C-alpha cells in the first residue's frame, strides 16, 4: 500500500488566508516551477503511479537568513494539492516552526502543509543559503541516482519523518550535496530533491540533471530512445 502524501507529523495549523501582499510574489515563483515540473511529469497525480496518490511538492524560504534553526519559516505547497492542474495562493501553507524530536510542525494557511514539510525544513536548517526546495518524482533520475553520483538517504528511513530530516542534515554535512544541490531518497520510490538559493536556481539544477539522466539513457544502446 502506498503512503504517498500521508502526513506523519503532529500539526498545529491555523486555518486562515495568506496575505497576497506578503506571499503572492513568492507563490507565483513556485507556481511557475511547479507548472514546469507538472509538464515534465515530476509532480502530479496519475492512476498508474503510486496507487493513484499525488506526488511532488515545492517550497521557498521566507524571512531573514539569520533565523534560528527550527524557526526558518517557509512557504510550501499544501497537502493533497499535487493532483491539481492549477494552484493558487490558497493551495499553500506557511510553516512557521518545527521540532524534529517532537515530530511537530506549526503552520497557517488555507491548506495543510505538505507531508514532506519535515524534509524541506531539514534542508533549510542545513544552511541559510538554501532558499528553495523542490521535491520531484522521477523514475529516470531515481534509477540512475548512483550512476549520476547523487547523495542518497538511507533506504530504511521512511519519508516525512524526523529520521528523514536527520538524514537530510547528514547528507549536507557529509556528502557532495552542497555542491551538487540534489539528492535521492533511497527508501522513497522515485523521490528526488533539488535545493537552491532561489526557485530558479533549484529548478535549473533539477532540469540539468534530468537532461543528463535522459542523455545517459539514450546512450545505453538498449534500443529505446530516452526511455524513462
For the regions a language model picked out, list residue spans one by one.
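Glycine-rich flexible loops
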Residues: 1-228
